[in-house]
């Protein structure tokens, strides 16, 4: 029932509800301390003690509801209102209209001869305006005891529903509940455009030992800008964005925005079937991109018109989005997050981002987002020393400071911080239907001595260098995500030999579904960057990955990190002239797509962009324009990537047994002088696929490749040297039949012509 339709107020002996957000006029001066003569027939309420009055006005009061609002006492009902800049405040109820006494400093009070607290509103008069509002200090807490209990335990898996700003109806009145965790604060006030950014009027109440502060503001609706003014333990004040904000201003502005989702998802079919296969037993080829620079200037909704069609045409099964959580500095590419619960507003609203994810799902494309639990920046309006003391960061400065990036590391041992991060992972999966989370910089979390000199770190309780708190966090996050969201995959960017990254948590592992194989990437790129004549001395770089290929469930990443900061683009790493560079680029991708592990390729590399990636300008799309003389060269590489993905997806041998030794067998691993590699992949039913790579610039005629005796013929299903891809066209037009000539330890072999700098796939 709305306030306007409520029956006549009954007498109460407790404060009731009904608030509304006042607004001080622009340009108003700070209120003067004055005590006006009381209106006719109105007695002032009993005066506040000097210390309590000071705490209220200075933002140090832990329970403003105890002194503001209305309550019964001897002689009637005492009203007290804090309205800076107001000329007068009048209590309005059915049969009642009484102006309160001006106590000075924006305080107004009155003791009215009533037997109970009525359902009242406040008529607030300013120099040039008069508004009628509900009193925020008549309301009971809008956060339940169960929420507080779960927050206190560090087990609130849907933390974003309890903390932050929540538009809602409370006690029959529409408004917004503001809640923030700030256990060290002497006081917290909420301010925003609804108060002309004056915080004095809206002190929040402390909800006991939880460390949570709460205030329900009637009349504050979606779209309102806000921040919290926190009084630190030293008495100073700091103005902060909401750590739980689900929407924020476009940087460099940094206020939080009240929001609620009304998006109606259209991806039910996708969500129902995405968990049919375990990710490591399903095809997965990932197109990594930076949303803001893929097509610079596009909004989320404009991206939804172009990105799904492009990715689907190329045959990728997933996209991986570099961090979309809000971040102040675009040059960080999103890896220095300040708004962990807010998709960046640079490209639109949270619902606009939902629209993009939905469009990708409807195109049959999974969505992985980069998630950054390792650190956060030091901006003084964000998380750093949020309530005046280390809160989200570790109390030990040596543990808090990230030595590589000048940022701060989370205190993984604090239950509320752990809850903040675990719930954040749940949030992206639940609220945005993402299909995977790639945890960034996991290695920096796992080791106490990561990038630290001796004396700059202290060992764990067992004397070791492992960060046991970080281990516990990652295990809890993975266990929670996999329990709640079947079909979602978590991926670790972990660059060390930590044992059990993708082992289940109940077996002592970290519990990730997949791990980036950084070692494979570095080794193989080192090989292909050498001149062909020198590659024989580095042959092991291409084979060593198989020594540990099944120790974890791997992703083979050619990511953004490999095409920036002087590392050159993928094609530019290759030696030789332009033809040789493209040929080696294509051969490498063919080798990579057939190798055990999932594939990841960063944007621009699918068409052999020659320059490094720029977050400002994005991929060099112009090289695909027909007016560019070499456009055909780049289009040829893109056509190859399309056919790699399509053939890969149609070949269960390449993904059904990706993480078990039975799915792979070397055929030729020792032909260092020839720069040749050959291996077999096997599907669950035993059907094979043969991959042969020749990384030398010469055609090798009559080359013997041993094959299984039971297969009667082999046909070429992919060849990176075909002319449409920009190759020389050396291929096998007809099926090849094994001959009874032993090779590589097998009784029969194929007599092949190996194209130069190329990879060939054959199937029965």
UniProtKB/Swiss-Prot annotation:
Keywords: Carbohydrate metabolism, Glycogen biosynthesis, Glycogen metabolism, Glycosyltransferase, Transferase. GO terms for biological process: glycogen biosynthetic process. It catalyses: Transfers a segment of a (1->4)-alpha-D-glucan chain to a primary hydroxy group in a similar glucan chain. Residues 17-28 have a biased composition (Low complexity). InterPro entries: A-amylase/branching_C, Branching_enzy, GlgB, GlgB_N, GlgB_N_E_set_prok, Glyco_hydro_13_cat_dom, Glyco_hydro_13_N, Glyco_hydro_b. Residues 1-46 are annotated as: Disordered. Belongs to the glycosyl hydrolase 13 family. GlgB subfamily. Catalyzes the formation of the alpha-1,6-glucosidic linkages in glycogen by scission of a 1,4-alpha-linked oligosaccharide from growing alpha-1,4-glucan chains and the subsequent attachment of the oligosaccharide to the alpha-1,6 position. This is 1,4-alpha-glucan branching enzyme GlgB. It comes from Kitasatospora aureofaciens. The gene is glgB.
